[in-house]
Every structure is written in structure tokens, then in C-alpha cells.
């Protein structure tokens, strides 16, 4: 996705009430990471990344600890990560990442959002060749030379690096998430966000009117409590 599109989404997230929208999604990401790889952040890079993302949003430590404990609790819900493929107008392709303890509820909600907002849900795996899963790290912009950082991180699985005025973006194969995170930590770089994302192999460009039309669907998807992330091929 293009950086302009990312800015647009970030602006929307900034308007969200953190207590009602952002924190529950971050807590669910922490619980899922802890269930998948264990509750010790030192041994679980995905959990470390989820905690770092929560801290970047000023999520209280008590909330973070509670989310980790939920993964270990005997009565904890069985939260599953599920992906749905869909399409919108103007050639827009969409992958929706959900974390849910009730897949029947979630798929019904996602289907309804697509159908009511000019989109269509597709058979599972329909977009698997249209996107590539990548490890994506957003870092505080460092004072060190970017080329030197790039050379250091290549040995840890770096495939690409980008920078803007406020941040440094580091990309790698999804299988290299742990090793790339290790390299970033060894260089004492500050992680703002870290995740596995689906990035489009080809993008589509929308004008302002088309973007507003598609965003109605994207906004509804992102507002759903079970939706953790929405990936598109918008430039």
C-alpha cells in the first residue's frame, strides 16, 4: 500500500477512542501472540512486538499484563486468527485479518459489511497470489546512517528499507520475523510497530471520489471488534 494511504488510515486510528477501539485490538493481538509462542516475551519475538505496539499507543502496563495472563488462563477463550478475502469497486482487493473466539459470528459480520457497502467476499485463498506476506517494522527514525543499518540488517533477513520524515520502515520475509526483530534490537533501534502484513504485488490508483467510496467499506471493516487489520492493493 502506498504511504499516502497509510497516512489516511493512521489519521483515522488517531481519532479512535483508545479505550473503546485501539486497546481491545492491541490486547487481543497480545493474547494471540502469547498463545501461539508462549508468555515469555524474551522467548517470543511476536509477543515482544505486540507489547511494543501497545506501549507505543500508551496502553497501561496492567492492561498488557492482563492480556498475557488471559493466554494462560484455564478459562481463556480459544481465539483463532482467520483471514477473509474480498473485493471492492475500482479493482480494489482486500484481505481482512480477524482474531475471534466465534468464527461463525465473525464471518457473518464480515460478509454483511462487504455486501452492504458495495463489496463482495471471495472464496478463501482467492488473493493468495496477489499479495505477499511480509515482516514489517516501523521504527523511530535513528540518527545512525541508514545505509549502515541496511547493511547490518541484511544478515538478519532484511529485504527492503524505506524512510520518511518521521520513521524508518524495515521489511523482510514473513519467516524472518524473529531474526529480523533480533537484529533491530541488537542495533538498539526503537520499534514503534511490528507486524506480519499482506503487501500487494501490484497496486491500483484511485482518485479522491473513488477513495471516499471504497473507504466507507474499509472503515466499517476496521470498526468491527474482531477485525485486527485490513490490507488492500490501493497505491
UniProtKB/Swiss-Prot annotation:
GO BP, sorted A to Z: regulation of DNA-templated transcription
Lineage of the organism: Bacteria, Pseudomonadati, Campylobacterota, Epsilonproteobacteria, Campylobacterales
Main location: cytoplasm
Name of the protein in its database record: Probable transcriptional regulatory protein Ccon26_04940
Family of this protein: Belongs to the TACO1 family.
Top-level taxon: Bacteria
GO cellular component term, pick one: cytosol
Record-linked InterPro entries: Integrase-like_N, TACO1_YebC-like_2nd/3rd_dom, TACO1_YebC_N, Transcrip_reg_TACO1-like, Transcrip_reg_TACO1-like_dom3, YebC-like
Keywords: Cytoplasm, DNA-binding, Transcription, Transcription regulation
Record flagged with keyword Transcription: yes
TM spans (from-to): none
Alphabetized NCBIfam families for the sequence: PRK12378.1, YebC/PmpR family DNA-binding transcriptional regulator
PANTHER family documented for this protein: TRANSCRIPTIONAL REGULATORY PROTEIN YEBC-RELATED, TRANSLATIONAL ACTIVATOR OF CYTOCHROME C OXIDASE 1
Molecular function via GO: DNA binding
Subcellular location: Cytoplasm
Amino acid at each position: 500500500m502506498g504511504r499516502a494511504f497509510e497516512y489516511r488510515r493512521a489519521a483515522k486510528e488517531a481519532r479512535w477512542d483508545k479505550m473503546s477501539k485501539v486497546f481491545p485490538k492491541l490486547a487481543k493481538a497480545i493474547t494471540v501472540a502469547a498463545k501461539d509462542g508462549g508468555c515469555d516475551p524474551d522467548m517470543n519475538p511476536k509477543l515482544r512486538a505486540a507489547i511494543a505496539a501497545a506501549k507505543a499507543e500508551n496502553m497501561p502496563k496492567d492492561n498488557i499484563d492482563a492480556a498475557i495472563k488471559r493466554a494462560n488462563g484455564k478459562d481463556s477463550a480459544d481465539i483463532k486468527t482467520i483471514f477473509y478475502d474480498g473485493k471492492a469497486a475500482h479493482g480494489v482487493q482486500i484481505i481482512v485479518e480477524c482474531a475471534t473466539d466465534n468464527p461463525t459470528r465473525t464471518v457473518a459480520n464480515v460478509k454483511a459489511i462487504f455486501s452492504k457497502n458495495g463489496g463482495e467476499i471471495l472464496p478463501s485463498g482467492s488473493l493468495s497470489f496477489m499479495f505477499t506476506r511480509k515482516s514489517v517494522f516501523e521504527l523511530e527514525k535513528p540518527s545512525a546512517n541508514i545505509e549502515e543499518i541496511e547493511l547490518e540488517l541484511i544478515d538478519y533477513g532484511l529485504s527492503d528499507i524505506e524512510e520518511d520524515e518521521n520513521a524508518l520502515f524495515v521489511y523482510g520475509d514473513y519467516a524472518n520475523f524473529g531474526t529480523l526483530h533480533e537484529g533491530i534490537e541488537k542495533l538498539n533501534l526503537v520499534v514503534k510497530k511490528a507486524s506480519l502484513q499482506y503487501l500487494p504485488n501490484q497496486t491500483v490508483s484511485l482518485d479522491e471520489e473513488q477513495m471516499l467510496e471504497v473507504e466507507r467499506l474499509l472503515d466499517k471493516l476496521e470498526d468491527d471488534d474482531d477485525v485486527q487489520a485490513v490490507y488492500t492493493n490501493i497505491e
